[in-house]
Amino acid sequence: MFRFLRVNMATKTCVFEDIPEEYAGLGGRALTSTIVAREVNPICTPLGPHNKLVFAPGLLGATNSPNGNRISVGCKSPLTEGIKESNSGGQPGGHLAKLGIMAIIVEDMATEGEWWQLELSKDSAKLVPSTVAGLNNFDAVAKLVETYGDKCSYVTIGRAGEFKLTAASIAFTDRELRPMRHAGRGGVGAVMG
């Protein structure tokens, strides 16, 4: 059974939701763009609390289909101020699909100076204080692997995202747990930061 995970950074809540009927049959880019179009006010500030960051694997995630494990990231772009989708390869897209998560919708903002990381498993999701704030992507992943092991996949933004640089990307780990797959268009890393 697939579902959405809605993460509110202000209240620190993570809530699993049934997928609304109007999203049936959508995945990846189609899903991220539709959610952003319906839920984000087009005149909001891209780096403000009313923007949302949406992660969605494609419909063929967790299958052996070529390119089936890609992941799409959508938001209002700080570069174009329009709906932006950026996608990446790596392991996280397939892992989300295996967990039955069709989309993660991150909304609102944490208090300035607070950094959080999302821990996901089959039946739970929670925000915990970040242990990797201030680290570059490679150092952050190395530290996360020490904590969570090598059977996970990781998503990081590094310093560029933390500083909300509008060209910042989001890094996704590959099979060797290197953060070398990037969603690099539209400044999505700045929105995550």
Indicate where each model-derived feature is located.
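Short, solvent-exposed amphipathic alpha-helical segments in soluble enzyme
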Residues: E21-E22, R70-I71, A171-T173
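Short, glycine-/Ser/Thr-/acidic-enriched flexible segments
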Residues: M9-K12, P20-E21, L60-A62, P78-L79, ...
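Active-site cavity-forming subdomains of large catalytic enzyme subunits
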Residues: G93-G94, K98-G193
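Short helix/loop capping segments that flank catalytic or ligand/cofactor-binding pockets
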Residues: V15, T63-P66, K164-T166
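N-terminal basic/disordered segments at the start of proteins
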Residues: M1-V40
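A generic structural signal for short, non-catalytic loop/turn and secondary-structure boundary residues
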Residues: M9, P46-H50, P66, T111-G113, ...
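Internal mixed beta-strand/loop scaffold within catalytic domains of large alpha/beta enzymes
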Residues: T63-V106, R178
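Conserved oxyanion/phosphate-binding beta-strand-loop segments in alpha/beta enzyme cores
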Residues: T32-N69, K151
